A protein has these predicted regions:
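Iron-associated oxidoreductase/ferritin-like identity signal
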Residues: 1-156
Length: 156
């Protein structure tokens, strides 16, 4: 099935965001594990795997629409040197990702590509859940203190 060139370009933009997320979240997970923060590691690692699965879905969709998935284009990684910076970088990445997803969903609606819209809507839901988690962690750090938060994330 031949896809709309603008939709294919936008889907590749969403793919770029997921590929960037895989790398950023994976590195944050491994940094946290190195610091003994098993809980933080587990969540970030799990999210990097989810990003990989979402990227796979986008690759499949682009191929189905007779497009060429661009796996070479990556965004800037926002790597933090400590947990608050990691959360800030993740939040920035996720809010940018959400904006692109929302724009692409609207574009799919306008071109009547409802299958791509539905795929992107599921990815948007996952992204918003991740944003909620990051904002909750930031709230915990602000209200319980960084030391207490880090202690709660340590391996037992």
């Amino acid at each position: 099935m031949k896809g709309d060139p603008e939709i294919l370009q936008s889907l590749n933009g969403c793919l770029k965001d997921q590929l960037t997320a895989i790398n950023q979240l994976f590195l944050h997970a491994r940094m946290a594990r190195n610091w003994g923060l098993g809980g933080f590691n587990d969540y970030e690692y799990g999210r990097s795997i989810k990003a990989m699965k979402m990227a796979d879905r986008l690759i499949e969709r682009v191929l189905f629409l007779d497009g060429l998935p661009n796996l070479q284009d990556l965004g800037k990684l926002l790597i933090g040197e400590n947990v608050p910076e990691m959360l800030g970088g993740d939040l920035q990445m996720l809010t940018d990702m959400r904006a692109r997803l929302q724009d692409t969903i609207r574009q799919c609606e306008d071109t009547r590509d409802f299958i791509s819209r539905d795929e992107l809507s599921e990815i948007l839901e996952e992204t918003e859940e991740h944003i909620d988690w990051v904002e909750s962690q930031q709230w915990l750090i602000t209200n319980a203190g960084l030391e207490n938060y880090l202690q709660s994330q340590m391996e037992v």
